[in-house]
């Protein structure tokens, strides 16, 4: 009887723990979707609609990345890095004031880079950065 009770209690504890971690998964899914929508600017010839993208930008980023700058972003990235060939999800980091989602990407001119997306507590995109990775030379 005691063994059955212990097994039952352990099962309930495991179910409760699974529920506690579910929020992180939902946040990650939403933030990945926002990041992938934003990265469409690097994939496609025709830009995604700015009004759709701007729905998920924080107030500060909406000011810093207006519609004209958004249009210029594609040209600037293509000039500096080339055309985006591949993007793979790399990491999800949770912080007190927001989250960070990172992708390993490959461009024509820059074979290995990272695109980092920073989100606030409300899952609005606060900032992004494209960081080229260089091989260490001996």
Q: What positions do the PLM features span?
A:
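Positively charged n-region of N-terminal signal peptides that target proteins for export
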Residues: 1-4
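Acidic, low-complexity intrinsically disordered segments
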Residues: 41-44, 83, 134-138
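Surface-exposed, charged secondary-structure patches
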Residues: 75-116
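Conserved short acidic donor-positioning loop in nucleotide-sugar-dependent glycosyltransferases
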Residues: 48
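Short solvent-exposed beta->alpha transition segments
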Residues: 51-90
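Short beta-strand edge/turn micro-motifs at domain boundaries
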Residues: 112-138
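Short, low-complexity N-terminal intrinsically disordered segments enriched in polar/charged residues
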Residues: 17-44
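Bacterial N-terminal signal peptides
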Residues: 7-17
């Amino acid at each position: 009887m005691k063994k059955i009770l212990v097994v039952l209690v352990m099962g309930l504890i495991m179910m409760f723990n699974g529920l506690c971690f579910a929020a992180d998964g939902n946040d990650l899914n939403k933030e990945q979707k926002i990041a992938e929508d934003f990265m469409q600017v690097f994939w496609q010839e025709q830009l995604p609609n700015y009004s759709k993208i701007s729905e998920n930008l924080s107030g500060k980023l909406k000011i810093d990345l207006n519609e004209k700058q958004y249009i210029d972003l594609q040209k600037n990235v293509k000039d500096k890095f080339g055309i985006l060939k591949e993007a793979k999800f790399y990491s999800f980091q949770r912080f007190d004031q927001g989250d960070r989602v990172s992708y390993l990407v490959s461009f024509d001119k820059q074979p290995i880079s990272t695109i980092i997306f920073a989100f606030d507590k409300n899952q609005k995109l606060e900032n992004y950065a494209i960081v080229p990775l260089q091989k260490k030379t001996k």
